[in-house]
Amino acid sequence: MRSMLVALFLALLWQHPSALAQPEPGQAIVAPNEVMALPEPLREQVHSQILHDNPGPHERLERLGAFMFAPEGLGMNYVEEANLTVAQAYQARTANCLTFTLLFLALAKEAGLEATPQEIEQILGFRQADGTLYLSNHVNATVRVGGRRYTVDVAGDRIIPRDRPVPITTTRLIAHYYNNLAIEHLAAADHAGALALLDVALALDPGYAAYWSNAGVVRTRSGDQRGGEKDYRHALALDPNNTNALFNLAGLAARTGDRSLEVEYRKRLARIQRTDPFHAFVQAVNAENAGDLPRAIREYRRAVDLQPQEHRFHSALANAYLKAGKTALAIRSLARAQALTDGDTRAAYSQRLDALRAR
């Protein structure tokens, strides 16, 4: 990897600033009830291309999936920075994970399908364009058809989930949209615009700790340290294990010279991070990039111990072993990665194993 970024606050689908769409100053905020509104031409397409012959639920779901990606339908393309409303996505034919989920849910409702948004609280993602590793939340949708549930996820192969997805309300999903826009405005140093958007997110879902933590970041960067501290503390009241709030409160304490408070926050943060496989993996990547292979191997092994079913952790450990000249250990770790996979991924691991064993 060429570079590494770990967000200091885990906004949903947090993007590296260079990858974010640049918001227009003074741009009007779309009302919450407009975020998932279907444009009339799109509604007509749903009825003419999906519902025209009154298909059954399974057929409707299959047609909807094809409609979203086929050139004769919407021809949607995944674009990481495309944080858009349903109407904007229809016009641009692009969507990120959040917008794709908003769009799918709106279309599923029009098609008479029972669909629900889901959230994975923490994921580890990798942006191939610039080698950036990032932490965030992730959303997708689940559909119930004939007693079975199907997951609809446009970027499932781009992430490493820590936890299983849990259902969330559509209100929270829409609040995430405003949170994402706030991050774009923050990256453009538009603090007033970011706070206005976070106000909407908080009005929709005041119990979501990450929004308060993000508001604390915006206030602190705008020079309002007292307001930022208040928001961070509120985030911790909602979620005592909110690592973003703890990290930023430790930073505030350090800047104000309160050493004892800084130590307290850093100890709390360290306790959480000791059982966090993503933190171990990030530390390992940092060490590997710095050329510290012994530490990288230790941290990769810790990540593997904490989340042993993640094949990419075993693969990364194998690569570190290989760089350290420990071929036998690399083969063992790669074999474990292979055993945890199937299909094309398993075949790719098999090729790598054959090449190593032939040395």
Task: List PLM regions with ranges.
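Single-residue signature of alpha-solenoid repeat helices
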Residues: 194, 228, 261-262, 296, ...
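TPR alpha-solenoid repeat register
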Residues: 211, 245, 279, 313, ...
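Canonical tetratricopeptide repeat
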Residues: 180, 214, 248-249, 281-283, ...
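Short coil turns that delineate tetratricopeptide repeat
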Residues: 206, 240, 274-275, 308, ...
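Canonical positions in the second alpha-helix
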Residues: 200-201, 234-235, 268-269, 302-303, ...
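Hydrophobic/aromatic-rich core segments of domains that either
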Residues: 102-172
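Secondary-structure boundary elements
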Residues: 26-89
